[in-house]
């Protein structure tokens, strides 16, 4: 170790997608090295290829352990798993070798984080079809990380420009999401989200719970989920000492959070929170996975096979994910 900055592990994602390109571009940014010590987990051949795509010239320092890193701008510190035949890799295509390799990068990152070599990980895009082709039986990052860390139910938070958004429901139909708005579930998530914020070092302010219906139901005129589930859950949480308010109409709650009235918003369904964050700033919307023994941030875009290999992919989101991991990791450890 040369300094006391947090060490952030960055698995390079699906080697046939834009992941290698956006991490290479990210490591040309001085701000990244000002905030942390980044280490890539991937394949040197893939990284060299990505540098060619992006017209970037950086040195590669292959290491076995984190403390061997140089952590200087102009040099990539790399845990080289050497697991890709570059002649067989087809950029921009679904293929098993890429899915299998991407899984191995994640697995190695988690192992290093568990051993204390990494303070956090910032992940890059993987592809569900490539995972399946590679006989990796997971549907995505969160499921992989949950299994590798023995976490039953990870909690996703989005952060963009200081606004934090949690999700009561995620990948279910809107009809199903409405059915899942129960007093018990809302109360459970208020507690879990509050605990997640505390673990991230966010102790000031209060959480807002978004309304489900127009005008939060208007006392039952436009739906009764607020009266039957949301309000009772909030009142019970308040009695338990949690700082939470609501329901606040979804047309205004995110604006109020952005202005600083609330430290976070509990969104009641997937698109309610996604629309708010991504409209505010699509590229800087970063996912933070809570509830695990390790801290993970992630870009919120896919492998972009259509532009992979062209050097066009923006690294803005990747830089943001790395810096956010560096921001929260010292507090997360406490």
Curated annotation (Swiss-Prot):
Entry EC no(s): 1.1.1.408
The keyword Oxidoreductase appears for this protein: yes
Gene Ontology terms, MF aspect: metal ion binding; NAD binding; oxidoreductase activity
Top enzyme class: oxidoreductase
InterPro entries: PdxA_fam (IPR005255)
Keyword terms: Carbohydrate metabolism, Metal-binding, NAD, Oxidoreductase
Top-level division of the source organism's lineage: Bacteria
Binding site for substrate: 141-142, 278, 296
Entry coiled-coil feature ranges: none
One of the Pfam families matching this protein, by short name: PdxA
Cofactor-binding details, from the entry: Binds 1 divalent metal cation per subunit.
SUPFAM superfamilies in the record: Isocitrate/Isopropylmalate dehydrogenase-like
Cofactor field: a divalent metal cation
UniProt: a divalent metal cation binding residues: 171, 215, 270
Keyword S-adenosyl-L-methionine in record: no
Catalytic activity: 4-O-phospho-D-threonate + NAD(+) = dihydroxyacetone phosphate + CO2 + NADH
Functional note: Catalyzes the NAD-dependent oxidation and subsequent decarboxylation of D-threonate 4-phosphate to produce dihydroxyacetone phosphate (DHAP).
Family: Belongs to the PdxA family. PdxA2 subfamily.
Subunit structure comment from the entry: Homodimer.
Protein name as annotated: Putative D-threonate 4-phosphate dehydrogenase
Organism of this sequence: Clostridium botulinum (strain Hall / ATCC 3502 / NCTC 13319 / Type A)
């Amino acid at each position: 170790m040369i300094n006391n900055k947090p060490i952030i592990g960055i698995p390079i994602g699906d080697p046939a997608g834009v992941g290698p390109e956006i991490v290479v571009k990210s490591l040309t940014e001085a701000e990244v090295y000002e905030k942390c010590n980044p280490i890539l987990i991937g394949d040197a051949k893939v990284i060299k290829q990505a540098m060619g795509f992006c017209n970037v010239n950086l040195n590669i320092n292959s290491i076995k352990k984190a403390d061997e890193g140089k952590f200087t701008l102009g040099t990539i510190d790399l845990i080289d798993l050497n697991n890709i035949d570059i002649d067989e890799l087809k950029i921009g295509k679904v293929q098993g070798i890429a899915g299998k390799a991407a899984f191995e990068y994640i697995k190695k990152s988690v192992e290093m984080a568990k051993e204390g070599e990494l303070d956090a990980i910032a992940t890059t895009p993987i592809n569900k079809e490539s995972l399946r082709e590679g006989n990796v039986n997971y549907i995505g990052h969160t499921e992989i990380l949950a299994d590798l860390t023995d976490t039953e139910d990870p909690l996703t938070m989005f952060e963009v420009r200081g606004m934090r958004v949690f999700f009561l429901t995620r990948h279910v139909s809107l009809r199903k999401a409405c059915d899942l708005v129960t007093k018990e579930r809302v109360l459970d998530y208020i507690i879990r989200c509050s605990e997640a914020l505390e673990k991230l070092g966010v102790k000031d302010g209060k959480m807002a719970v978004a309304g489900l219906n127009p005008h939060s139901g208007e006392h039952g005129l436009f739906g009764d989920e607020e009266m039957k589930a949301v309000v009772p859950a909030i009142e019970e949480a308040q009695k338990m000492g949690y700082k939470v308010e609501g329901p606040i109409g979804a047309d205004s709650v995110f604006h109020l959070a952005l202005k600083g009235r609330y430290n976070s918003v509990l969104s009641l369904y997937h698109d309610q929170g996604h629309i708010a964050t991504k409209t505010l700033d699509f590229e800087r919307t970063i996912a933070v996975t809570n509830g695990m023994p390790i801290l993970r941030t992630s870009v919120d875009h896919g492998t972009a096979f259509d532009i992979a290999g062209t050097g066009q992919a923006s690294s803005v989101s990747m830089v943001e994910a790395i810096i956010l991991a560096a921001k929260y990791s010292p507090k997360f450890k406490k």
